[in-house]
């Protein structure tokens, strides 16, 4: 093998940038740490951008996606063939590329974020690679990020689709290492498996209980803690904002994020008289929520930003008087961790106001103002408490404690804990 050939490879299969999703950021963060931990070839294998657009996923502006470090390659395999089954064609492209990466002689760790379809793609590629007779040295990690269970498996349980649920569990448990993004997610996995077992006499729950570990999402703390404060005022001024001068929502604009409750709660608060509300993000509910805001009693105090890049996001979080994510369970989505909440706590500024939905308590600990789900009046009270009744010294003390708690989710800490189990030869620099 030529000296220039890689010696250790990490492959991450995920919906990557420009998708607005915490797990696209997690993939980036794991990749960046891997380059410092002895992996000299890191591949993020994902979907072509037109496919992401066609799926209706919220996407960042392409020119706003930050570059990756040397040694990290983003691959977007083209579809295979021209028959009229688009999903199969693109899936075939991804599986085919993974087979090539698994059979070129480089020892590889392959990690999938989302079981459906990414863990399935990895499993299919490993089976093909080994059947080829070519040397194959692959260790697999499957990460259940939440919607795998809250959407796919739960639907299978509720609609008695045994085969679909069995496929997800079998694929998941067939990986070398199984992890979930929170204890809440693992509990959901076990609960769903128990429902399948009770109905069909299978034994998925016991295997999930024994084999699934917790690996929290990896977050680049430096992006939020090493903020250039000299730029803060200038960045905010371009948006017509000032430091400590607005309430912020920054996430995907969907029903499950509780933006409707935030708009109503803000309109009912006294804090509206002191600071405006900024809703930053894109998503399918944006038009309806813009209309809701326009019809509210404080329409002139609510602004929407749909073009925030990763760099500006940090400043918006740091400069906010309060950050609100009023998540609520929906059939299509439950907040299984709360990456944006951790990012806000790392950035500093005013307090986080959120709900105890899903895995959010694991993300925030005792460092957030918790309000009931779907309760705008409680949001109004929390905003008034945080903005009108808390001294600057109190807020600074709370912000420091929140940042200290959030550091456990730093990407280096998460990567090292995960790979201590997966690949003990990986040593911290």
What positions do the PLM features span?
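N-terminal subdomain of nucleotide-sugar transferases
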Residues: 1-63
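Nucleotide-activated donor-binding/catalytic signature segment of Leloir-type glycosyltransferases, i.e.
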Residues: 126, 244, 287-312, 322
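Donor nucleotide-sugar binding/catalytic pocket of nucleotide-sugar-dependent glycosyltransferases
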Residues: 139-142, 166-231
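Conserved donor-binding/catalytic core segment of Leloir-type glycosyltransferases
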Residues: 179, 214, 219-221, 241-267, ...
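A charged, aromatic-enriched C-terminal amphipathic alpha-helix characteristic of glycosyltransferases
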Residues: 223, 257, 393-423, 429
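Acidic donor-binding loop of glycosyltransferase active sites
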Residues: 318-333, 350
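Short hydrophobic beta-strand element within catalytic cores of glycosyltransferases
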Residues: 346-354
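Conserved acidic donor-binding segment of nucleotide-sugar-dependent glycosyltransferases
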Residues: 354, 366-377, 385-391
């Amino acid at each position: 093998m030529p000296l220039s050939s890689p010696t250790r490879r990490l492959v991450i299969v995920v919906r990557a940038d420009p998708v607005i999703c915490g797990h696209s950021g997690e993939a980036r963060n794991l990749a960046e740490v891997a380059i410092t931990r002895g992996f000299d070839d890191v591949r993020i294998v994902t979907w072509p951008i037109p496919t992401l657009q066609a799926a209706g996923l919220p996407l960042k502006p392409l020119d706003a996606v930050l570059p990756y470090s040397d040694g990290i390659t983003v691959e977007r395999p083209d579809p295979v063939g021209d028959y009229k089954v688009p999903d199969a064609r693109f899936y075939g492209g991804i599986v085919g590329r993974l087979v090539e990466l698994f059979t070129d002689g480089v020892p590889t760790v392959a990690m999938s974020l989302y079981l459906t379809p990414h863990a399935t793609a990895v499993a299919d590629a490993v089976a093909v690679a080994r059947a080829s007779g070519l040397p194959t040295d692959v260790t697999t990690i499957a990460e259940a990020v939440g919607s795998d269970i809250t959407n796919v498996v739960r639907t299978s349980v509720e609609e008695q689709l045994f085969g679909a649920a069995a496929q997800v569990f079998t694929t998941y448990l067939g990986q070398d290492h199984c992890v979930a993004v929170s204890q809440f997610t693992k509990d959901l996995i076990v609960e769903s498996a128990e429902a399948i077992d009770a109905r069909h006499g299978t034994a998925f729950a016991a295997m999930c209980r024994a084999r699934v570990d917790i690996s929290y999402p990896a977050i680049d703390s430096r992006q939020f803690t090493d903020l250039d404060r000299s730029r803060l005022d200038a960045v905010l001024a371009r948006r017509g904002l000032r430091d400590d001068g607005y309430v912020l929502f920054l996430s995907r604009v969907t029903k499950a994020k509780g933006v409707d409750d935030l708009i109503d709660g803000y309109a009912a608060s006294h804090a509206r008289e002191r600071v405006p509300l900024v809703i930053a993000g894109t998503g399918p509910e944006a038009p309806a929520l813009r209309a809701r805001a326009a019809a509210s009693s404080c329409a002139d105090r609510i602004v929407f930003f749909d073009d925030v890049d990763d760099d500006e996001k940090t400043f918006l979080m740091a400069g906010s008087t309060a950050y609100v994510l009023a998540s609520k369970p929906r059939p299509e989505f439950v907040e299984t961790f709360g990456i944006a909440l951790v990012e806000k706590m790392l950035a500093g500024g005013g307090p986080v106001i959120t709900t105890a939905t899903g895995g959010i308590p694991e993300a925030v600990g005792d460092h957030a103002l918790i309000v009931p789900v779907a309760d705008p009046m409680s949001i109004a009270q929390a905003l008034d408490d945080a903005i009108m009744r808390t001294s600057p010294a109190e807020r600074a003390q709370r912000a420091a404690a929140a940042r200290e708690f959030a550091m456990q989710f730093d990407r280096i800490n998460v990567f090292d804990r995960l790979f201590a189990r997966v690949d003990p030869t990986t040593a911290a620099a």
